[in-house]
Swiss-Prot record:
Gene Ontology CC annotation, any one: cytosol
Regions of compositional bias (Basic residues) in chain numbering: 838-850
Protein's UniProt name: Autophagy-related protein 13
Entry GO MF terms: protein kinase regulator activity
Ranges of biased composition (kind: Low complexity): 1-18, 403-422, 498-508, 541-551, 856-871, 950-974
Gene: atg13
Annotated organism of origin: Emericella nidulans (strain FGSC A4 / ATCC 38163 / CBS 112.46 / NRRL 194 / M139) (Aspergillus nidulans)
Length: 974
């Protein structure tokens, strides 16, 4: 009837609440996994479910072995990479193989070595759990134990100063209370590498096998960075520099590997000791980062010296340099300050006082062309034109007067012409006088690009004053005229402005002014003579003077405070601007507007080219004609006049010379003929005929020769080359008969002239004694001697083309102007000259016959000679002398017969007896062509007129009888 308590119900509820709390607690733990507890939803519990999480937290032995391999190779690979880049390690080979073993861990292939086996034994036997590796320290250092007593290891700082390393380390050790061992005192540590494995955070995870591939990939990046960066450090550069050269053994880098716990690095450290004084850092540190792994974080760090410039020097030399203070600082002379320069007042002729430091260079002291611009100070990249323009604008915009004490160095700079060193202009005093320029001529003959001036002005010249305007004519200096070579090498340039008066010329000489300047404007030629002025001195090329050029540093020449004018620079700058504007305005000049204009231009160019080619072809003939005319004009003068007017030609009368010499003006040698290439009729007195009589009849074979023929004629053996147009000795012809119409009138010959001329003989003519009695003296001597008349008939026939008397009278001559004009022509007699067989005369002709008589036998003949034209050479010397006498005397008559008189012959010289031949060839002492009223032209004379002579033979004239008539028909002048 009353209720009973229910005990089972609360018990069941308590049991379910306990299960729900246990489920919630397991789900919050990281080891709980829903996939392994799917069967718990039914409330079924087993004992195996509670032991499963403890078994899955332990990794397998295979995964632990892989972790240990990574830790071991992590240390050994780092040591191999570091030491391979610092020292030479011997490779290790496999058994029975010559191929070295290669370490391919972390995708960096390096040769294995057994040299590090003992030193790396600690890190080869370590593991990640029980025997963890200590930090590995690798040091590279220099060992000074190998130095001798007179050798010292020195370190060079950034300024190149030498420091004794041993003394520096000893000084650093004495400043600290703790001292290192003596064995470490001689070591200079370059680098210190630290490879370390950090502490492991906890137990190894159960899924260690899945994490290891990711750790390996991260390590590849680390070791590749280590391999690359190890070759960027200063120690590697020092090793490579010594490896290329045979360095001292003390400079070879050594290494050591030790554990990080072996010593306390807080004590004395040689790596951080400074070796020399300075503000730079002694050491620097670089870290390659941290690579996470299940065994702990991997890290690599390097501490290195920033300066690794070492060398071995002699101890005594280093000590003496320290005593002398040569390495303390670079010697710098004391320089005046800017205020001192402003207070200094220049004096006339004083030494240069303005000096500029390198920090404040004078921009006008630049040299070079427009394309190569060199500064005194640091390079600013400014071209010379822009620098000059900036200087001009600065002067124009400067409000301060020119007499201000403080001047801007750039505004006060007066730039000289491009290519020359300039001087600092002085505007404070307009009346400051300039010192005379002192030019240097280092070369005898300057090359094409030589800049020194060819003319040196006198050192005693008065200084020129430079004012605001141009230099007046009265203040200009004068200089002596240069030589002929200088004037020919540097032609004068003319300008529109200032003309300077010269003491050697009456007319003023213009100063050189150019339309516009270029890169070679500093090489403009200077006038050959006359004075110079300031503008000319400024424009002169390469005048190394104290006023117009500023010396470069170290040359010994200092710049001087002068009033150099810059008008020439401004004018050049303005001319360049105007020229560029003109090119912009007249662009049609470069590009023709139409095709017609282009065709016209091409036709004009073609015509001009054709004309130029034609005139070039005429150049040689015109030059030869000019030389022939000059030779004909100059050969009739005396030796004194000829030697003065011809440069390099000795005055030797009777020598066949011409002015057709080389352009260089070298002297004409008497060994080589210098005759005109073109026949000239300017002077008949300088042409003679030494040939035999032309034969045009029945008596024998004629020897016909034209005056215009070439020299390639048949001749007998002779050592002298035939010359087409030779000239004859001046003493053969009398001075009283000269043609008034001749272009070159022969001057009167005197005995003293003849003696001087014929005694001037070439050395090559031999050692025979010359005759002191000349032909002219013998000719005048026979005028005073009794002359015997020896009449002989002339077998050569009549010498007229009009049928007149065919015999020619060679009458006696008497002294006086009218001696030849009064000669009788009516009788068939010939006067024999008493000097024709004179021994002196024979020897003179013999000399000319044998050795070329100052030009050969052709010097006595204009057309042909007795040797070259078939003349018979007598076998006996006496007969040969007689023939030469006859040839020398009859040359003049033969010449005049060719020029205007008809001449015939009944027989040649070969057909005559020797006695008659000698008498026939007696010389005529008068010029037949001088009696003619006029001359026939060259064309009419070449046609020739023929007429019968008195002996019945047909005589021919080379150039016709003309208006002169025959010999018997001459009208004698009173």
């Amino acid at each position: 009837m009353h209720q009973q308590p229910r005990s089972p119900a609360p018990a069941a509820s308590t049991s379910s609440a306990r299960r729900s709390q246990d489920y919630d607690r397991r789900s919050d733990s990281p080891a709980f996994d829903l996939r392994t507890h799917t069967n718990r939803g039914l409330g079924i519990e087993t004992e195996n479910d509670t032991a499963e999480p403890e078994q899955s937290s332990q990794p397998g032995p295979e995964a632990i072995s892989k972790v240990n391999q990574i830790v071991t190779n992590y240390h050994t690979k780092a040591a191999l990479i570091i030491l391979h880049s610092r020292v030479e390690l011997p490779p290790s080979y496999a058994k029975n193989s010559n191929v070295p073993r290669v370490n391919r861990w972390f995708n960096v292939e390096l040769e294995e070595t057994d040299a590090l086996k003992d030193q790396l034994k600690t890190w080869r036997t370590c593991d990640a759990t029980d025997n963890r590796p200590p930090p590995m320290i690798i040091e590279t250092y220099l060992d000074t134990a190998g130095l001798t007593n007179n050798q010292t290891l020195v370190a060079l700082d950034d300024n190149g100063k030498r420091w004794d390393v041993t003394e520096s380390l000893a000084a650093s050790q004495s400043s600290r209370p703790a001292k290192a061992s003596s064995s470490r005192a001689v070591d200079v540590i370059l680098e210190r590498w630290r490879v370390e494995l950090g502490d492991m955070p906890g137990k190894l995870p159960s899924d260690l096998g899945a994490i290891l591939p990711t750790v390996y990939k991260k390590s590849i990046i680390l070791f590749r960075s280590l391999f690359t960066y190890s070759k960027f450090l200063p120690a590697w550069k020092f090793i490579k520099r010594n490896g290329r050269s045979r360095a001292h053994p003390a400079l070879r880098v050594k290494y050591r590997i030790f554990s990080g716990h072996a010593r306390d690095l807080s004590k004395q450290d040689h790596l951080t000791m400074p070796l020399f004084e300075g503000d730079t850092k002694v050491v620097d540190t670089y870290s390659f980062g941290v690579t996470d792994s299940p065994a702990g974080p991997f890290s690599v760090q390097v501490t290195y010296r920033t300066c690794c410039d070492f060398r071995v020097d002699d101890s005594e030399a280093l000590l003496s340099s320290q005593f002398m203070g040569a390495d303390d600082e670079i010697f710098q002379p004391s320089l005046p300050s800017g205020g001192l320069d402003a207070r200094v007042t220049p004096e006339v002729g004083s030494a240069p006082l303005t000096r500029r430091t390198v920090e404040d260079p004078d921009l006008s002291r630049a040299y070079g062309s427009l394309s190569t611009f060199h500064h005194v100070g640091p390079t600013t990249g400014a071209s010379p034109i822009s620098a000059l323009r900036a200087a001009r604008e600065a002067r124009a915009s400067s409000p301060s007067p020119p007499t201000s004490s403080h001047r801007n160095s750039f505004a006060a700079a007066r730039a000289s012409p491009v290519g020359r060193a300039a001087t600092l202009a002085n505007d404070t005093n307009p009346n400051v006088a300039r010192r005379p320029s002192i030019s240097f001529q280092p070369f005898k003959a300057p090359p094409l690009s030589a800049s020194p001036s060819l003319v040196d002005p006198p050192l005693s010249a008065s200084p020129r004053t430079t004012g605001a305007g141009r230099t007046s004519l009265s203040d200009s200096r004068h200089m002596p005229p240069p030589s002929v070579t200088t004037s020919s090498r540097k032609p004068p340039s003319f300008g529109p402005d200032n003309a300077n008066s010269s003491p050697n010329s009456a007319s003023p000489r213009p100063t050189p002014m150019s339309r516009y300047s270029s890169a070679f404007s500093h090489r403009r030629g200077r006038p050959s003579s006359g004075g110079i002025n300031k503008l000319e001195d400024d424009n002169s090329s390469g005048r190394a003077s104290a006023t117009s050029s500023g010396a470069q540093p170290g040359s010994g020449l200092l710049a001087e405070i002068t009033g150099t004018s810059s008008d020439s620079i401004h004018a050049d700058d303005e001319n360049i601007s105007e020229f560029l504007k003109m090119l912009d305005l007249r662009k049609d000049l470069l590009s023709p507007s139409s095709q017609t204009a282009m065709d016209n231009h091409s036709r004009r160019m073609t015509a001009a080219s054709a004309a130029l080619s034609r005139f070039r072809g005429m150049k040689d003939s015109n030059a030869a004609l000019s030389d022939s005319m000059s030779s004909s004009l100059l050969m009739n003068r005396s030796s004194a006049t000829s030697s003065k007017q011809l440069s390099g030609v000795p005055g030797i009368a009777g020598t066949s010379i011409s002015t057709a010499s080389s352009p260089g003006g070298k002297a004409i040698s008497p060994h080589t003929p210098h005759t005109p290439a073109i026949p000239s009729r300017l002077s008949s007195n300088s042409i003679v005929d030494n040939t035999t009589t032309r034969l045009h009849g029945d008596n024998g074979s004629p020897v016909e020769e034209d005056a215009s023929d070439e020299t390639t004629t048949e001749r007998l053996p002779s050592t002298v080359t035939a010359i087409p147009i030779p000239t004859s000795p001046a003493t053969i012809f009398p001075s009283t008969f000269r043609r008034s119409s001749s272009a070159a009138n022969r001057r009167s010959s005197h005995a003293i002239d003849d003696d001087e001329i014929f005694t001037m003989r070439s050395v090559s003519l031999g050692a025979e004694e010359p005759s002191h009695t000349t032909l002219g003296a013998l000719q005048r001597q026979q005028d005073y001697e009794p002359i015997g008349t020896n009449i002989a008939p002339l077998e050569s026939g009549a010498r007229s083309s009009g049928g007149d008397d065919g015999n020619v009278l060679r009458g006696p001559t008497r002294r006086g102007p009218g001696a030849h004009r009064d000669a009788s022509l009516s009788g068939p007699t010939v006067a024999t000259s008493p000097y024709s067989h004179h021994p002196l005369h024979q020897r003179r002709i013999s000399h000319s016959r044998g050795r070329g008589f100052s030009g050969g036998p052709h010097s006595l003949s204009s057309g042909s000679s007795s040797i070259a034209r078939g003349g018979l050479i007598h076998p006996y010397p006496a007969e040969r002398e007689a023939e030469r006498d006859a040839n020398a005397g009859a040359s003049h008559s033969g010449t005049e017969d060719r020029r205007g008189t008809g001449r015939g012959s009944g027989g040649g010289r070969h057909n005559l007896p020797q006695a008659a031949q000698v008498e026939e060839d007696e010389p005529l002492l008068f010029a037949m062509s001088d009696f003619g009223a006029s001359r026939r032209s060259f064309e009419e004379g070449r046609q020739g007129n023929h007429g019968p002579d008195s002996s019945g033979n047909t005589g021919s004239s080379r150039r016709g009888s003309g208006k002169r008539g025959t010999l018997s028909g001459f009208h004698l002048w009173p």
